[in-house]
Amino acid sequence: MWPAGAGTKLPCPRDSALRRAAFSGNLTALPSHLVPAGRSVRVFISANPEDTGAERQALRENVYPKLREFCRENYGLEFQVIDLYWGVEEDEWDSPELQKTRMKLLENCLKTSAGPCFVGLLGEKYGNIRIPGEVEASEFEMILDAAIEAKLETKLLEEWYCRDENSVPAAYYLRPKSEMLRSNRNAMQPSTNAENEKTWQEISDEIKKIFKAAVKLLHEKGKMKHSQAKRYLFSAIEDEFDFALGKQTPAFLKKCVCYIRKIANIERFVKIPEMGKYMDITGTEPRIIRDPEAQEKLIKLRDEFIPTIVASSNLRVYTSVTHCDMKLGYSQEIENHYIEGLGKQFYEDMIDIIQATIQQNFDTETDTLYDEILQHSSLCKTYASFYEYKCESLNIVHNYILPSKAGHINPLIIYGGPCTGKTLLLAEVAKKAYGWLHEDTGPESDPVVIVRFLGTTDMSSDLRTLLLSVCEQLAVNYRCLVQSYPKKIHDLCDLFINLLNESSLQRPLVIIFDALEQLSENDDARKLWWLPAHLPRFVRIVLSTLPNKHGILQKLRCLIHEEDNYIELIPRDRKMCSQVLKHQLLRVKRKVTSGQQIYVNNALSKCTLPMFVNLTFREVRHWRSHKDVDESSLSVTVHESIEQLFWSLEKKCGQKLVSRALGYITMAKMGLSEMELEDVLALDNSVMSELKENTRPSNPLRVPYLYIARLKEGLSGYLIERHVKNVTLLVWANRHLQLIAQKLYLQDDNDLREMHTILADYFLGVWSGGRRKAFCLEDPYLNGCLDLENRSLLEEEKHFMEQASFDRQAPDQPWVFQCNPLEPDIFFVNHRKMSELLYHLTRCGKTDDLLYGIIMNFSWLYTMIKIGQFDKVLSDIELAYNYSQEKELKFLANTLRSIKNKVTAFPGSLSAELQQRLLPVVSSLPKLRHLLLECDKDGPKYCSIVPLHSSMDVTYSPERLPLSSSHLHVTEILPTCNPSTVLTALENGSISTWDVETRQLLRQITTAQSVILGMKLTSDEKYLVVATTNNTLLIYDNVNSCLLSEVEIKGTKHGSSATYINGFTLSANHALAWLEASKDVTVIDLLYGWPLYQFHCWYEVTCVQCSLDGLYAFCGQYLNTTTIFHLGSGEKLCTVTSEFSGGFVKFLLILDTAQEMVMVDSEGSLSVWNTEDISSPQLTDDFDCRREDSEVVSIELSEDQSAVLICKALSIELLDTGLWKVAEKFRAKHNERFISAVLSKNGDCIIATMENTSAVFFWRRDTGQCMASLQEISGSIVKLVKSSHHNMLLSLSTSGVLSIWDIDIITAMSNIDKTGKPIQSLLLPARGEIIYSLDGSDCVHKWNFSSGFIEAVFKHEGIVEHCVLTSTGDIMVTSDDKSSQYVWHTSSGENLFRINGQRISQLLITHNDQFVVSLCEENASRVWRLATGHRVCNILTTLQNAFITSANTFVVGMTKSKVLAVSLWTGSITKKFCCEDGTTIVNFKLIPDCPDIIVFITSAETVNIWSLTDEVICRRVQLPNNFLKNLEDFEISPNGKLGIIARGDENINVLDLYSGKLRVVHASGIIWRQRLSRDGRYLVYICFRNGEEEDENGAIFSLIVMRLADGKNIGACSLYKTPTFLALSQRHLNIIVGFDDGSIGIYTVVDRVDAALKIKIATSNSRQIFNNATHTSRPKCNSYCFKISVDCLWRESTEVFARDSPITVSDSTESNEATPSKKHNSCYERVCSALEARGHSYAPDN
C-alpha cells in the first residue's frame, strides 16, 4: 500500500514550495485552495437569459459533456459550467436573490477555476435593469423623496418595500413575491399562476421605472454618486462583464472568452413579435420601437468597454454578424446555423485555454503520503476559519508548545463533550503553531507541525497506517533515510519514537491528534500503549478526546498523572455567548432588536455550546424587525437546531431534493463532489418529479444549478469542501450534522436501497454516453410500459418509452482516464469509482455487478496493483466474498497472494500470470470465465504474451479447523448445506456448530454428560438427531439448538448384558434405531418425538435404509437377509435372503430410478433385487466375492445412480449399475490399505485415503492416472466425509484437525495432461494445429494445439530418438534405439511400414515431403523415397547438425572442421568449405530466405557468410575477444541481416551481419534458450534467475518476448516448472514450452491488438471450454502400436524387403530414378494420398 522508500523523498529545490509547506505544516503558506490540480474547471456563463436560451441549451446538450470528458481523460479534473438561468422559470430571472447568488458564484469561479473561468455571450439585447433586494434606509427615503418630487406614484414602493431594523444600518427590503401575491402555486390552477406572473411583471416594470427616474434625478443633482447609481441603472450582464473583465491582469484575461452576436439591421424587424426577445423594445402597439437608452448602454458595453480590454490584454473576443430573413427576421434556421458555429468555436477555445493553463500532473496519483497530508491540511484550514472563541485554552496550548529549558515534557490532553469546540481549537493551534515556534526560536528555525484529524481518512482511522504516515512525514522532514518500514506494529512504534528524537531547537516538532476515540480498536490502539508518556525536549504532542468514550481519558490519566497536562473545554457562560453572537451578527451587518434579545437570552440560558451559538446565529440573521418571534422561534438544543436548519432548507429548495441531496452526501463513503451531486440528483426520478411538477421535462434532464447553489449557501460552514485524491468533496464538518441527516433522511430501508442503487449505477456508468433513463410518472400503466426488462414492446409503447426517457448526462466511469491509448501506463485513476462503487454495490444487493463490475474486472485489478494498492485489492475481494460467498472469489484471492511479488514488481504481467493460473480451473469455477475474457481483451495492452493452454499445477490448501487434541475424542462430523458450516460431536457430549473459514464457534449443545455414539441431520436440516450411550435418541431443533424430545430405545429382551444403540437412520419424518444384537427396530415420529411402533425382524439387525420418498424401510440382518416394512403403517411387506449367506448385510443401497435394492455383505458380495413389486422383490444379479480376503470399508452410490463405488481394504471397485459389471478396478500397492474412498460430484474422479498416510489421493476414472497427492500437514487421515450438498470433502487427521477440501478445484488438475517424463523435443508441422513430443520413452505423444490435451500415443519397440513430419503433419517418420525406422499415418495411427537395420543419428525430410534423409554415424547414410521406402542414394560421409536446402538440392552438414554440401540425388560431396590455420567450425545455420547462403562461426571468433553456389565467403565479421568462450546458441533472421548470439549469460547479443556492429541488450535473467520468430521480428527467450531470487512459488524461469525493432520487452510470463524445450510455430507466433513433468504450455504473442488475433484467442479451445454452457468431456486418448513385422531390412548398401511387405520390390536401378514405381499397392497409395493432400491444402504461411 505504501510506495517503497517513501522516507527517501527529500525536499529538494525542484519540489514546489507548496509541497514543502504542506510537509512541514506551515499552513499559512498554503493557498486557500490547497491543490491546484484538485480544483475543477468552473466556467461562469454571463448572458441575458431571454436572447441566449437556444445557445445555452445547445451548449449544454452537445458541448459541455465533451469538454467534461476531455478534462477527465487528460487532466483528471471536472469541467463544470455555472449557468444560473438554465432551468429557472422566467419570473425568477429578475429576482434579487438570484442576482446576488450570481455575483457570488462569479467571484468564486474567477478565484477557483483551474482553467477558463468566464464566458460572456452578448447579443443585441442589453437586458433589464435590476430590482434592488435591499436598500439602506437613508438611501431609500432619499429615492422616495426624489420620486415624489418627480411627481411619480410611490404607493408601490411603499407597499413592496418594508423597513427592517435588524439591518445595520437600518434598511428597506423587498417583500417576498409569494407573500405579496398570495398565490397558491398549484398545478391544478394554471390560470392563477399565469395571472400572478403577469401581475408581477407589471409591478416589477413599474418599480424599475420609479427607481430609474428617481435615481437619475438624484444623480443629476449630485446627491448620488455614479457608483451608487450604477446598481439601479445597469443591467445584470453589464455588472457581470465589469466585475469579471474590468480590473483584471492580462494573464488572468487569457482565461476569459466573449462571443458577440450582431444582427444586421435588426431595427427593421422590431414589429415581428418573436424579435422582442433579441432586442430591448419600448412602446406599445402599433408604435413599438427599439429602446434607444438600452441600445446606447449596449453600444457602450459592446463597442467601447470590451475593445478597450482587448487592446490591453489577450482577451479572446469573437464577433459574428448574422443577417435576418426578409420575412421571418432572425429565423430558426439562421439561429441554428449560428449555434452550430458557436458550439465548435466554444469547444476549441475551452480546449486551448485548458491546455495553456493546466499542467498534467501524474505525480499525485502515486504519492499517497502527500495526498494524506493535503487532506488534513485542507480540513485544518477549513476548521480554523470557523474558530470564534478567543478563550484561555488557546493561550495555555500556546505556552505549552513553546520550547522550554528543563523539566519533563508530557503530551497535552484537551477533552470535553460533543460540540464543545475541541476540533476547532486544535485546528486553530495547528494553523498558528508554525508561526509561534518561528517567532520564538528565530527566523533561522524551521519547525515541523504534523496534524491528523483521526477518523476523517482511511489512513488516520487505523493505528498502523496512522503511525506509518506520521513516520514517513517525519522521515521526509528530518531527512532520515528509512530503507523499509516495519511490518510489525511494535517495530513501527519504536521507529516512531526514534524519529521523535530527531527534533532539535532549530527544528522543533508539534504533533496534533484530534479525536483519539475515532481510532479503530485494531492493534489495541485505544489502550494507548503506543503513545509516549515522556517526550524529547523539543517535541510537543497535543491530543483531544471525548471524556466518556472507550475509556480513553481514563487510560490517559493512568499514563500521564500531572493535572496541568489536561484542559477541559466547558460550556461558556451566557453573557460571553451573547457577546460572540453579537459580533457574528455585526460582521454580516445584522443585529437583534431588544424585544428579540429576550428570546435569544432564553435560548442561550439553556445551551451555550459553541455549535449551538453558531446555529442560533444562522437562524437569527434572517429575522426581520416587523416579523413576530416567540419562544418557539429558537430551538434549545444542538440537535433541534440542526433539524430546524434542514427544515428551513426544505422550504427553500424542496423537500425531496434536500432529503435526497443530504442523504446522498451522508451515505457516500467519502462524500460527493458538487458535480457528482448534480449528476446523482439528475438520476433520481423522485427529485426530478418534484422539480418538474409544473413543467414538461426535456433533454437533458438535469437539476438547475441554482438549487445546488442554494443548498451549499444554506449549509456553508457545515457542508465543507475536502480535497481527496485531486477531487474536492462535500463532507459534513461535524459528526452531529451527519447523525441528524442520517436520522432524518436515511431511515427507510426501501429508500436506502434505492439510493445506494442510484449511486452504484452512477459509478458503474450505467446511464453514461447519452443512454436515456426512463422518467417514471405516477401512472402505473405507463410505468409498466417503461420497464426495460419487459416483454417485447408494441411499437406505440416503444415510441412512448422513447418519449418518456431522458438523457441525464451522467459521465462515463472507466477505472482510469487515459489521455493517450498508445501509452496505456499513463493515466489518471478514477479514485471516486475506486472508493465508492464497491461500498454501494454491497449495500444495494447487486451481486452480479459486484462480481463482474469490480472483482472480476481486469482493469480494476491492474489499476489497483499499478498504483500500489495490492492489499486493498485483497481486502475488497474478501469483503465481496463475505457478501456473496462465491468460492471463485476465495480462489482468486489466493491466486493473487501467490503472484503478489511478481505483479507488484511488474504489473504488466498480471494478465498472463492470472491466465496461467485460472485456465486449468475455469471449467470447475465457471464464474472466473469473465475475468479470463477481460484478461484477453485488456491484458495485451500491457503484456503481449497470452497463455492459450496452461500446464500449471493447481496449488491448493484446504480450510483447517482444530477440533481436539486427538481424533479419538471426535465421534462425528456432519457437513451442512452451507459450505463453510460443519457440526462436530466430541465424546464428552458437546456438539458444536463451526464456521470453518473464520474458525468461529457459532453455537454449542451439551448432551448432559452422556457419550455421543453418532448424530445425523434430516435432509431439510430441520432436526438434529443424536444417539447416546444412555440408549436414548435426542431430537434437537437444529436452527435454534434446543432439545425437542428424548426417546429411549428398547430392544429384544434376552440376557442381562448391557447393550448400546447399534445404529440409527433418518427418513423425512421418522427416525429408526436399533440396539446391539437386537431383532427389533424402533420407529420414532420426529414431529411429536414419540415411538410409533417396532419392526420385528428374523435375525439381528445390522443396517437400515429408507427409500428416498420415505415410504419404505429396508432392514439388513445376519445371514444376508433383508426385510422390507411400510413406514406409514408399520406393516411387514416381505423378507429376502441372498444365497451367499456366509456373512451379514453390511450396506444397503436403494436405487429409486431403477427401482432396485442392492445388498452388500461383509465380504463384498453383492445381490441386486428388483423392487418394482415391493411386496415380492426379484433377484436380478449377484456377485460372489468371497474369494477376496479384504473386507468392505465403505460403499457409495453416485449422484446419478449410474455407478456404485465399493472400497475394500486392498482394492477399489466401480460397478456400472446399468449392466451390473465391474467397470474399473484399482488395487492398493503392497503393504498399503484403503481407509475410505468417495466419488467426486460428477463421478469423474475417485478420492481415497490410505492407512497411516497423511495424503489424499485423486484418481481419474477414465485413465486411472493419479492426478494429485495432496498432503494433509496435520497428520495421518483417519476419516473421510463427503458433503451431499456441495462438492466438498471433509477429512479428520490423527491430531484432531478437520480439513475441508473443495473437490471442484482439485479435479481441475485433470485438465492438465502429462507424459510423465521431461519433454526432450517438440515438433510442429508447417501447417495444422498439432504438436508432437518426444520424452525419452518409447512413445511419441500427439497433442491437440487448441485443447492442450494428448490425442494419441504412438508406441515404439525402443526409445524414440528422432522424429520428422511432412509439412501437413499427415505422415510422421520416427526412429528408435533398436535401429528401427517407422512411417506412421498420424490421423489413423497406422504404422504404414517399418525399416530395420541401422541406428539413425539424424532424420531429415525434404521441403517437398518426397524424400527422407537418414543420417548414420557408423554406416552409410541414406536418402530414400517416403512414398515407397526405396533408396535414392547412399551418403558415405558422416554429417552432423545437417540441414536440407530450401531447393531440396543439398543436405548441408559439418564434419571434422568442414562444411559439406552433399547432393540428394547422387550422395556425392558437391561443395565444401575448410577452415584454414587450424581453426574449427563451432556452429552453422542456413538463412531461411536465402537458400544458398550459409552462416557459420569459427573458433577464430569470426562469423562467415558463405555462398554455396559460388563457394566463396561473401562477408566476414570479427567478434570481440573471448566472445565465444561460452557460446550456447545462435539464430539468424530470415533475411540474413541479424544474428542473435546466446552465451549463457544475462545479455542478448544482436549482431548486424551487414555492418558488423554488435548491440548488447540486457535480458531479465540468465538466458537458457532463445528462438527467433519466423518473420525475424521477435526474439523469444527463456531466462532464469539465481536461486536466491526465487519467489514463493519457485518460479525461477521466465518466458520473455522481445521486439527486435526497438529492443523492448513486450511480454513476460513466469514459468512455474522447469522448462526442457522451447519451440515456435511457423504460422502466427505461437510458443510451445515443454516441461520436466511431461506437460506443455502453449502461448501466443499479440503485439498489436487487432481483430484477427482477438478472434484467434477467443476461438482457442481453452476459451471454448468455458464458453460452452454444457462442457463436454475430453476426447479419449488413442493408443497406436508399432508393427511387429519388419517391412524392409537395410544392409551395408542394399535393402531386403519382406515377402509380405506392403512395399513393392523393384529393380536396383529403379531405386535411383526420380519417378516412383508403377506397381501400386494400398500402403503406397495411402502415403501418396497423404502427400498429395499437401498440394491441395497448401496456403501461404503467415
From Swiss-Prot:
GO terms for cellular component: synapse. InterPro entries: Beta-prop_NWD2_C (IPR056534), NACHT-WD_repeat (IPR052752), P-loop_NTPase (IPR027417), WD40/YVTN_repeat-like_dom_sf (IPR015943), WD40_repeat_dom_sf (IPR036322), WD40_rpt (IPR001680). Pfam families: Beta-prop_NWD2_C, HTH_NWD1. LRR repeats lie at residues 386-410, 677-698, 724-747, 883-906, 925-953. Coiled coil: none annotated. Residues 410-737 form the NACHT domain. Signal peptide: none annotated. It comes from the Eukaryota. Keywords: Leucine-rich repeat, Repeat, WD repeat. WD repeats lie at residues 963-1004, 1007-1046, 1140-1179, 1229-1271, 1272-1311, 1314-1353, 1355-1394, 1396-1434, 1476-1516, 1522-1564, 1614-1653. This is NACHT and WD repeat domain-containing protein 2. It comes from Homo sapiens (Human).
